[in-house]
Structures are given as structure tokens and as C-alpha cells.
């Protein structure tokens, strides 16, 4: 199993960080978790593409995690030479999002169907809405979902990917909660979105302060990793993004609560998880 952070950014546009997206490469295909802005550009850099994604998993329906859904649908369809339906797995509401996106694309779809004689089918994604439990079991790859807590955004889910004795958890946006704790037990890697409470409180803008009550701080994520006994904590979706020279501050905040390896993600940060 191979883990690639395609996008380590947040809702705030950043010239160096694409929007939230994590690629897990397995023997059964590429699994994409969330699809923030620029995801296919980063996927190309990682040697993947829309057509290579077996399944797209959405942790929740905030715009920064779904911005490039339209690009994935379009590029998968327009670059395939036979019907190649996109599988999308996400919380309740995902069906409405995908249907609305495909409706929005109707004009462009019509243009391409008219222009390309060999393109005789329209994109038609297959959506599965989930709350908890096993959501995929194919070729030795097991994906499990559990509810997380990003209230007032409801519902939200985290995902665990197991293959060959190794396990990765993609938390999405959440505060510490029992669902995430259960998902993480015995995992090798936890990919967790985080904010810097101290910096946000120092800035003091009301709209920015609002993010504190539904995101985990660096310390929160570290404590979650410690409770579960994971080996590696990957910090991503960092708000505000680390400025040059401050990276060690983030690592130190996590290390105060977690004794394992801490990785401060950048776009295309890669972790290899060979079979034990």
C-alpha cells in the first residue's frame, strides 16, 4: 500500500498547496479520499489520473473537499474509450451533490457528445451513501467507515483502509470523537486535518475563530493518535498554513502528546507501507 497526500491545503487558496485530497494506491486500484482544488494536477504528478481512480470517497460535503468533483467526472468520462462509471462513496447528501454536479455539466457533456463520434455515452456516477461499517471489500482491500464530529456539518465520516496487514485512516475534518478513536485502533498511519489554535486566537477574526469549534488542533490530533497507538501521524489541511521556518513548531506541538512519527504534509508527501 502506498499513501500520497495530493493536496495538503485548506479552504484558503495557497500557491503551494492543493485542496484536501489523499490517494491510497492498493493492489485493487487507486482510492481517492476527497477532491479539493487542483487534485488532478497533483494526481498527474503522482502518476495517477481520473481514469485510474477506482473509487472516490468523500469524508463530508464542504466545498473545499469537493471542489474538483466536476473535473474528475469530466476527465474520467472524456478520456475513457468505454463506459467507465465513477464510484463515489460518501455520507448522506452525496447523491444529491453528484447529481447536481452532473446536471451542471450537462451543457459541456452535450458539446462533447456532439463533437466526438466515438463518445456515445454520458457520465453516470454510481453513488453509495454510508454512515458506518464496511463500505468496500475487494481483492484483499477493506475500507471501513465510521461517523466523525464536524458539527454543525452533518453527517461526516472517516475511512480506514486495510490491506496486507497494514492500515491507514483518513479522518477528514473532525474534533476528537469515539467514532474516529474506534477507526484508528491498531492503524499504522492516521492522516488528520488540523488547525493551530494558538495562531488563530492570536489573529482574532470572528470568522476564523469559528473554525476552532469543529476542527481538531494539532494537540487534539496527537492525542487521538496516542490513544489509538498508531505509528505515524500525518498532519494536513493546516490552518493557517505553516510559514517557512515554523515547521518545527507544529511538530513539537504534536510530539508533546504523541511519541510516534509525526509528518507535516506537503503536496505529494508519500509514505510506503510494505506488507509486514
How should each PLM-predicted stretch be described?
Residues 1-169, 251-276:
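Binuclear metal-dependent hydrolase catalytic cores
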